[in-house]
Amino acid sequence: MYRIAKIKVDINQLEKYKVALKEQMNTAIKVEPGVLSYTVVADKKDLSLITIIEVYANLEAYQSHILTSHFKKYKDAVKDMVLSLELIDTELIERVHKDDFK
């Protein structure tokens, strides 16, 4: 399952936000078998526009993830930093990786 989160962060709190995000992602990857990867990018023209590509083993893994204490801690920590949040559920069309050609 691929989910995209588009987040507008208060630019004055961006560094603090990135610390909280990194802590949450690292914990999730370490302790949740169904959390497969995170990719985080920022808009070059506006670094406060963050896009996170989240990959989960399945819907159940995502639903379990949002109930964890580390995710709830992250949400509480960033609630005053996040100015807007858009979550986009996606359907994978294709994924090609370098390792596919070895």
Predicted regions mapped to residue ranges:
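An amphipathic, aromatic/His-enriched active-site/gating alpha helix that lines ligand/cofactor pockets
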Residues: 23-31, 35-37, 55-89
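Short, well-ordered beta-strand segments in beta-rich or mixed alpha/beta enzyme
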Residues: 1-8, 37-66
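N-terminal first-folded block
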Residues: 1-31, 35-36, 40
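Short acidic, gly/pro-rich beta-turn/loop elements at beta-sheet edges
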Residues: 15-17, 48-50, 62, 97-100
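Glycine-rich beta-strand-turn "strand-cap" elements at beta-sheet edges
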Residues: 40-48, 75-102
